[in-house]
Amino acid sequence: MKQYNAIKVKYPDALLLFRVGDFYETFGQDAIKTAKILGIILTKRGAGSSSETELAGFPHHSLNTYLPKLVKSGLRVAICDQLEDPKLTKNIVKRGVTELITPGLAIIDEVLSPKTNNFLAAISLGKQIGISFLDVSTGEFLVSQGTKEEVDKLLQNFNPSEILVSKQKKESFSSQFSYPYQLFYLEDWVFQHDFSIESLCTHFKTKNLKGFGIENLNDGVIAAGAIMHYLSETQHQKINHITFLKRIPKEDYVWMDRFTTRNLELFYSNNLNAVTLIDVIDKTISPMGGRLLKRWLAFPLKDINEISKRHEVVKFLMEDLNSLNQIQHHVKLIGDIERLISKVATFKISPREVIHLKNSLEAIIPIKSIAEKSINTSVKEIGLNLSNCDELRKRIKETLLENSPVNILKGNSISSDYSDELKELRRIAFSGKEVLDKMLTRESEATGITSLKIASNNVFGYYIEVRNTHKDKVPEHWIRKQTLVNAERYITEELKEYESKILGAEEKIMALEIEIFNNLVQWLGKFIKEVQNNSFLIAKLDCLSGFSQLAIENNYCMPLIDDSYELDIKEGRHPVIEKQLKAHESYISNDVFLDSDKQQIIMITGPNMSGKSAILRQTAIIVLMAQMGSFVPAKSVRMGWFDKIFTRVGASDNISMGESTFMVEMNETASILNNISGRSLILLDEIGRGTSTYDGISIAWAISEFLHDNISKPKTLFATHYHELNEMTSSFKRIKNFNVSVKEEKNDVLFLRKLVPGGSEHSFGIHVAKMAGMPNQVLKKAHMILKKLEKSHSNEELTGKVKSIKEDHQLQFFNLDNPILEELKEEILNIDINSLTPVEALLKLSELKKKIDN
């Protein structure tokens, strides 16, 4: 245990798998955890002695079965292997940790999800917050820096499996980022700028980082350097597939804070078994395409030209169904070449996976041919940039057998035609039947024993078996090996020599196959960038083909995007809700029009369950889908591009931070109001409902007024129960009232789910309570109370008070009866601003301020 303890002390945070012969063993607390997670037997080592300790283990060949379960449980697992052949040493076998598997550094297929990246992140808390992401399974390495809100958003989009943070900044990180991330703390010296630059330049073999366009991202570079250090610390030395460090160009993408991503349920939902947007729009076929689609959804584009290029490809493939079908057919034959080529770099690839890589690259050839002939410029460009990888495919075909096994140690991976030496060794090893038949015939004739049999087993090797009735005919030079009830087994010098020859050939075959395969994998490393480029192009084409398939299946339209400030949606639908309707049901579509001049804010009133929230969400989703390059669920859409999408929809507590539902709502709304622009789309649902009625109306009114009067004029949909807000349209020219209509029939209400002009006077909350099965006694009492409240608190009374506050505020502001204010007014009016220099203007402003202060 001395050797084990010496290694374990170096990896106190990891579960240590200690190789002992044919088993991986765990001891002590590690054994208790292992037995519980894997469901294997927990035993004792040295039971009853002073060195007694828990023990649990499994066969070494079962590592790929058990390791994923340990990593998925959130453990860091250190694999300690035997570094020398036990047969060649008389001392304790030398052992060492060959790899440290962590949640963020997993390249095991059983741990990874095909259409989801597995990112490791590092965060540097400096002047700005630096952040870097690495998916070691694909080689994608990204860097950025920014504010807390920007980094928070990136964390939600990339959803890292593990985050590296400085030990000294532990509390600072926890106070800013409250989500339950898997964290690992590194020493503070790792997060140094010079150290990071040196680490990155050493890996990329460059003198500086200017070629990556990140030299000004000091905090981002520090985060990226921390990741490189972590790779080294965890024994990940073979990382040639990490070929580039890319800046995340935040200015190119639509800004959506983490609340918006959550509220729109793009990737996740708080409701169990709920369908998300990605579930509906993902028509990709390849793993690479699935991963890229998630990136496109998280980062919609702002550049009209780039968006239009995607739309044109989708349109082209919809019109050329033959090309679409052919492309999708061949993409199905392509495996995850991005992760396969990463396995080449890390030497974790199997013979069967190399064959899979070759077959996948062969499936690219017809795709390249189709794309090159395309009349669409973007598709043609993809075709021209795809590589046939002729040399790579040829070498694999010459070297490996098509039915190569998963493990090189199983043998029969290398083609005999590739090596004359291998061919000869196989002839010796596998032509044994012919040799043994000749030997059997010769010995039978010499002894006169017709029932002789030559066979072998793992214990005695080859032998000649003679039944007892003929054992008196056995020659003296035969050597007895084993006695059975009815027979005797012998060996001869000739048979012994032959056995030695066969066993020697089999060992040499195995060694030669391993050598040839390792040389092949090393040679394949030259094509990493070429295959990675193919992977990206196929992923891109897969996404666009998926958009075409999506539009065909669901009758989506091509949105028209321009530089205007309008949003004009005709018969828009919610893509997720419409897919969940029953066969006989149809989705009630709705029109939405917003601009900066006449209809900047739409105030939507209507009953509970009438569909207000759905209209808000579908508007945002249509804009988002349009700017990610997809067609959209509507009859037509014409829109100016948006740079920010904000949503405040739904309610949730943040108990861990001590925040109520109302506080969370106010935080999210404040974030929106502090970050709006002229190209923002804002969706607000039931703002102010978490407090008293008067507080709620006051807050909702003030927010609406702020948005209306703001110079940016952000386009806004505001769904509310406060019917008093309908009065705002008379005072604010760009606020228009709409309601989600209902039809009252006797004591029943029919939700029509249609957005129509005009405000609504009723919420029908009691009717919804009735639908929920509320007792009649409660419903009757509620109805009586409602009638009394409606009489005592009329809309006119409430809105009159709000309007008078606004008018009083304006009168007070412009009341200039005060002599000092009158003097200031005259002085300001007499200033010739055209002749003032900037410095003189500042001095004049300072002078006026002093007069007011005095």
PLM segments and residue spans:
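Active-site phosphate-binding and catalytic loops of NTP-dependent enzymes
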Residues: 103-112, 238, 375-378, 437-449, ...
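Terminal-proximal interaction/regulatory segments of ATP-powered molecular machines
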Residues: 457, 829-854
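Extended, charged coiled-coil "arm/hinge" scaffolds of SMC/Rad50-like chromosome-maintenance ATPases
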Residues: 401, 484, 488-521
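ATPase nucleotide-binding head domains, primarily ABC-like/P-loop NTPase cores
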Residues: 12, 28-29, 217, 285-286, ...
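Charged catalytic and DNA/RNA-contacting regions of genome-maintenance
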Residues: 1-316, 325, 329-332, 336-345, ...
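Charged, surface-exposed helical/loop "interaction arms" that form contiguous linear patches used
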Residues: 346, 350, 360-363, 416-417, ...
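Amphipathic heptad-repeat alpha-helical coiled-coil/stalk segments that mediate oligomerization
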Residues: 191-199, 255, 266-268, 359-434, ...
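Amphipathic alpha-helical transducer elements in NTP-driven molecular machines
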Residues: 1, 17, 28, 60-67, ...
